[in-house]
Amino acid sequence: MSDSIQERYLVGYALAAKKQHSFIQPSLIEHSRQRGIDLVKLDPTKSLLEQGKLDCIIHKLYDVYWKENLHEFREKCPGVPVIDLPEAIERLHNRVSMLEVITQLRFPVSDSERFGVPEQVVVMDSSVLSGGGALGELKFPVIAKPLDADGSAKSHKMFLIYDQEGMKILKAPIVLQEFVNHGGVIFKVYVVGDHVKCVKRRSLPDISEEKIGTSKGSLPFSQISNLTAQEDKNIEYGEDRSLEKVEMPPLSFLTDLAKAMRESMGLNLFNFDVIRDAKDANRYLIIDINYFPGYAKMPSYEPVLTEFFWDMVTKKNHV
């Protein structure tokens, strides 16, 4: 059916320049166009009510004016999906409220697969870090992460802390999370509405009891990534053959988990990082949740996103 007679839908996007460059690829534009969906760039400084007859809005902007703009649009056009609502997104900007999502899930208990989150404590006072009580019941080594998870460079600055000496580099507020050996593999689960895809990535290598006893201080994650094989620097996304033999978590388990998370958070676009406990192959831990991740890195992202857009503009299903 030609574009001239096919019913067409308008999906507006409001993204930061870097995000727009990585996400709005020509291949995605063409995939969507062939399905009858036109992707149009929105001007966040102007009223959304003056930018055409929109059938759906996707966004990843957080300033106050944009939130007010969205609020006005939602009041005047309540039937148009806004993906996603700012108040729902904000929950993921704090690493405590982020993982509380998981602990509060109502999810059927399975004998074969169990899930949870690593033990963690929050330190709000930097003076506590220099003492010996910051860890609570945790034991070294621990992972130190900034409390804020707003996507800034600062929020990605993490450390593996081996001992009390390593704590000196940290500043509050910060989250201290137990380190769980997981075979050096992380599973990144991409959620796009009802669509779920999982990929394997290299992660922090396991730490032996011997190494725990001899390692000192701290290591930033950028250095830890260099501890794995030399050839890692030449490995592109999805091309690490050393991971081929690593078994994926059951897709049915991940799909059910993603659905429960989606409904609990009220979000359609996110990914979550999962590790498998090296001591218990049926125990999975969710360690991070990100809103509107780098979907262009996901294999075959164009048809997945196009199908999601179609679901949204035809009002099939969104939270």
Swiss-Prot record:
Phosphoprotein found in the keyword field: no
According to its UniProt entry, the protein's GO biological process terms are: inositol trisphosphate metabolic process; myo-inositol hexakisphosphate biosynthetic process
Sorted UniProt keywords: Acetylation, ATP-binding, Kinase, Magnesium, Metal-binding, Nucleotide-binding, Transferase
Q: Which SUPFAM superfamilies match?
A: Glutathione synthetase ATP-binding domain-like (SSF56059)
Entry binding sites for Mg(2+) 2: 288, 290
Q: Look up the record and name the cofactor or cofactors this protein needs.
A: Mg(2+)
Q: Which reaction does it catalyse?
A: 1D-myo-inositol 3,4,5,6-tetrakisphosphate + ATP = 1D-myo-inositol 1,3,4,5,6-pentakisphosphate + ADP + H(+); 1D-myo-inositol 1,3,4-trisphosphate + ATP = 1D-myo-inositol 1,3,4,5-tetrakisphosphate + ADP + H(+); 1D-myo-inositol 1,3,4-trisphosphate + ATP = 1D-myo-inositol 1,3,4,6-tetrakisphosphate + ADP + H(+)
Q: Name one GO molecular function term.
A: inositol-3,4,5,6-tetrakisphosphate 1-kinase activity
Family matches, as Gene3D superfamilies: ATP-grasp fold, B domain (3.30.470.20)
Specify the superkingdom.
Eukaryota
Function, as annotated: Kinase that can phosphorylate various inositol polyphosphate such as Ins(3,4,5,6)P4 or Ins(1,3,4)P3. Phosphorylates Ins(3,4,5,6)P4 at position 1 to form Ins(1,3,4,5,6)P5. This reaction is thought to have regulatory importance, since Ins(3,4,5,6)P4 is an inhibitor of plasma membrane Ca(2+)-activated Cl(-) channels, while Ins(1,3,4,5,6)P5 is not. Also phosphorylates Ins(1,3,4)P3 on O-5 and O-6 to form Ins(1,3,4,6)P4, an essential molecule in the hexakisphosphate (InsP6) pathway.
For this chain, the family text in UniProt reads: Belongs to the ITPK1 family.
Name of this chain's protein: Inositol-tetrakisphosphate 1-kinase 1
Q: What is the lineage of its organism?
A: Eukaryota, Viridiplantae, Streptophyta, Embryophyta, Tracheophyta
